[in-house]
Every structure is written in structure tokens, then in C-alpha cells.
A protein has these predicted regions:
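PLP-dependent aminotransferase-like
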Residues: 3-78, 86-87
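Short, hinge-like loop/turn segments at secondary-structure boundaries
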Residues: 50, 97-100
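Short, well-ordered beta-strand core segments
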Residues: 55, 79, 97-98, 111
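Active-site glycine-centered loops adjacent to acidic/histidine catalytic or metal-binding residues
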Residues: 82, 102-103
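Active-site region of PLP-dependent enzymes
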Residues: 89, 93, 103-191
């Protein structure tokens, strides 16, 4: 996305996953970190960002409603929304939006991107995820604690990994998932 948008500078929150920071560093874009208020909203000067500059917004706990996202889009112009923790919140037209399958659906890799940018995914290498499945599959036969270190090691590897296309294994697993059932269970657990 950063390549397609020709991103020269990105504003990131201090409270952010290393894999995002690593991807931004590898893109060559200048990074400026910003603080957030107690509601996890950016504390930044309100201004339209020039071409090539983007504000990265993370929807940590559903605090970014559609109306708030539209407000940030109107103020800053160039925004990227990270719905890693709000997987079932629909993307808005004209707003680049990321969703992490790995963090939300229990697969070893993969993400969805909603954008109108012209991408060339075929130029990215295909990921192979079989070797990163042990900690996920092991939890079904043993306890999560047994595979905790493997999960941490797996997550650490993403910081240095280049952007790849989703593995065929992950794509096949995601096609078998009952998304409406998962959403209903998540909402029930929230109550």
C-alpha cells in the first residue's frame, strides 16, 4: 500500500505493533510518532496532509466509529485505518483499511486490504506458512502455554519479513471459516 500510494512520510501512534513499524521502516518512508489522548485518539495538529503523507489510525477497541473515521478523513485527507482489533467493522469508501487475519482469526499469516489504490500483488512473493503453524495447531492437542514461546518467536519474525502474498494454506483456511458465526460469538463474548 505504501508503495502504491508513494508514501514519503507516515504518522504512527507510539502504541503500535512492531510489525507495522518494521514494514514502515522498510518502505523507506519517514516516520513521525504521535501521542494519543485517553480515548486513544490522535493528538495532532488538524491540517490537510500534503501528497505523500499519511496518518495511520489504529482502531484498538472500536473507538474509531465510522463517523470518527470520516471526520479524520475530512481533516487529514490521507489516512490509513488499521482494523486489526475491529475485524468486522466494514471499510469506508475511499479509506485505505487493513485487517489482520493472523491476529483475529488464528491463522499464521495473512491480511485483507480495502483500497482503491492500484496494487501489483503478483510482484510480491507467495508466502509459505506451514512452518509457522505449529503453535496454532499444537493448542488443539495440548495447552496454549506449551506453545507460548513458539508463538512469540513466530510473531518476532514478522518484524523483519518483507510483504508477501497470503499463503495458499492460509487462503484455504480462511475460505472455510464461518465469518458470521465468528462475529456472533465475538459479540456474545463481549457481553
Amino acid at each position: 500500500l505504501m508503495e502504491a500510494r508513494r508514501c514519503k512520510k507516515i504518522y504512527l501512534p507510539f502504541f503500535l505493533c512492531d510489525s507495522v513499524t518494521g514494514a514502515c521502516e522498510r518502505s523507506g518512508a519517514e516516520i513521525e510518532f504521535y501521542h494519543m489522548d485517553e480515548g486513544l485518539h490522535p493528538v495532532l495538529e488538524e491540517r490537510t496532509l500534503p501528497e505523500g503523507e499519511y496518518l495511520y489510525l489504529v482502531n484498538y477497541y472500536g473507538q474509531l466509529t465510522d463517523d470518527k473515521i470520516r471526520k479524520y478523513k475530512k481533516i487529514y485527507g490521507n489516512i490509513i485505518v488499521d482494523h486489526t482489533h475491529a475485524f468486522f467493522q466494514k471499510p469506508l469508501p475511499g479509506v485505505d483499511t487493513l485487517y489482520s487475519c493472523r491476529k483475529f482469526l488464528g491463522v499464521s499469516d495473512g491480511a485483507y486490504l480495502s483500497t482503491d489504490a492500484e496494487l501489483e500483488p503478483e510482484k510480491k512473493p507467495l508466502d509459505h506458512s506451514m512452518g509457522r503453524m505449529e503453535h496454532i495447531l499444537g493448542r488443539y492437542e495440548y495447552d496454549a502455554g506449551t506453545f507460548y514461546q513458539k508463538m512469540l518467536d513466530n510473531a518476532a519474525n514478522y518484524h523483519e519479513m518483507e510483504i508477501r502474498r497470503m499463503s495458499r494454506l492460509t487462503g484455504n483456511l480462511l475460505r472455510t471459516m464461518d465469518y458470521s458465526g465468528i462475529k456472533a460469538r465475538r459479540e456474545q463474548n463481549y457481553r
